[in-house]
UniProtKB/Swiss-Prot annotation:
Organism (species): Listeria monocytogenes serovar 1/2a (strain ATCC BAA-679 / EGD-e)
Stated name of the protein: Peptidase T
The UniProt record lists the keyword Metal-binding: yes
GO MF term list: metallopeptidase activity; tripeptide aminopeptidase activity; zinc ion binding
The protein's role, per its UniProt record: Cleaves the N-terminal amino acid of tripeptides.
Length: 410
């Protein structure tokens, strides 16, 4: 299993599937369709049934039941795209066997070092096989570790018919990182009663609470005048954007929050004197606080527009997804069965809120309750991203055990 996981994973991460927030098509980048087509071929090769990919890059396939029982159809999902935070082009995965617990030099020329001093959790991976970046890209364990684990789990179940299971549906979705994954996902065609995203972090993570999420895009329109004659005439759009940001509580940012604390996050600010643009994301677990945060953003925009003139500030505020806890708690047994599967494999479940989102957040509101299971990765979305091969083995085993337990309990 280890060898197959390593082979598939290192193949998948080399396909550039970074999504693109600015694109209006689906998938937003051609690399996602390239990977989708690779996976379709491989799914057919291992013997999966009803293998399809639609024009939008959604891959679906079926592993038929080998049980005589009436078992609920369950699904496993992962996403094709990688994050926009750092390039996913020319990913060169580095394999470090029997990690010694010390600094890992990712890139000598650029002096990029993955160090337990900066990332203390590395100490827990001593003796493991770590897969890292070369210090110039992200790795893409989010979520190609999940894709790999689903592929290997399905292959294992096909080759081990003595493991009884009900019908299993799998899906690989585009554009999750920009919040569009479930937009064109056909829940009815998927046909599962419950599903799981393999999109979590370290070993044991199990999540059924997510943020409520919104995005805010603000355009500031200034007035560019020659600096020598600018008095009482120039309006600097960049300074307007800075003034906007100054009115947001500084301690309510990602770098100062944890647990159930929400935040405002300035993703980007660019422009010039004439025009500037800011892009924020807004996150909170509590729905009322979430609404308050959006109201605060809107009120700042209104105040600045009143100050600088009509049309000087344009705000586009969009909800992205909601806390899936509300939809999963009524069927909490689907979380409990994963906890049981983990314990059967000597994994201690670590149930915590997702300080982020998954396709499952939106799918749960579309009628498909979808908790999130660990994929094994750490430090997602950056050059220090890595995954332990042993954690990927365990995640694969969890998929298999969950399928077995669903059949056993009927």
């Amino acid at each position: 299993m280890k060898e197959e996981l390593l082979k598939r994973f290192t193949k998948y991460v080399k396909v550039d599937t970074q999504s693109n927030e600015e694109s209006t098509v689906c998938p937003t980048t051609p690399g996602q369709m390239e990977l989708a087509n690779i996976l379709v071929t491989e799914l057919k090769e291992i013997g999966m049934q009803e293998v399809t990919v639609d024009e939008f890059g959604y891959v679906m396939a079926t592993l038929p039941s080998n049980s005589t029982k009436e078992v609920p159809v369950i699904g496993f999902l992962a996403h094709l795209d990688t994050a926009t935070d750092l390039t996913g082009k020319n990913v060169q995965p580095q394999v470090h066997e029997n990690y010694d617990g010390k600094d890992i030099i990712l890139n000598k020329d650029l002096n990029v070092v993955l160090s337990p001093k900066q990332f203390p959790e590395l100490a827990g991976y001593k003796g493991k096989t770590l897969i890292t970046t070369d210090g110039t890209t992200l790795l893409g364990a989010d979520d190609k570790a999940g894709i790999t684990e689903i592929m290997v789990a399905m292959n294992h179940l096909i080759n081990h018919p003595e493991i009884k299971h009900g019908k299993i549906r799998i899906a690989f979705t585009p554009d999750e990182e920009i919040g569009r994954g479930p937009e064109r996902f056909d829940v009815e065609a998927f046909g599962a009663k419950y599903a799981y995203t393999m999109d979590g972090g370290p070993l044991g993570e199990l999540e059924y609470e997510s943020f409520n999420a919104a995005s805010a895009k603000i355009t500031f329109k200034g007035n560019s005048v020659h600096p020598g004659t600018a008095k009482n005439k120039m309006v600097n759009a960049v300074k307007m954007a800075m003034e906007f940001d100054a009115r947001i509580p500084k301690d309510e940012a990602p770098e100062y929050t944890e647990g159930y604390e929400g935040f405002y996050h300035l993703i980007s600010l660019n422009g010039d004197v004439e025009q500037a643009r800011s892009y924020y994301i807004i996150r909170d677990f509590d729905h009322l606080k979430f609404v308050e945060r959006k109201t605060h953003i809107a009120s700042i925009a209104k105040e600045l527009e009143e100050k600088y003139g009509e049309g000087s500030v344009e705000l586009k505020l969009n909800d992205q997804y909601y806390n899936m806890r509300e939809k999963i708690e009524p069927v909490k047994e689907i979380v409990d069965i994963v906890s049981a599967a983990m314990r059967n494999l000597d994994i201690e479940p670590k149930i915590s809120p997702i300080r982020g989102g998954t396709d499952g957040a939106q799918l749960s509101y579309k009628g498909l309750p979808t908790p999130n299971i660990f994929g094994g990765g750490e430090n997602f979305h950056g050059k220090f991203e890595y995954v332990a091969l042993e954690s990927m083995v365990k995640a694969t085993e969890v998929i298999i055990e969950v399928a077995r337990l669903f059949e056993e309990k009927e």
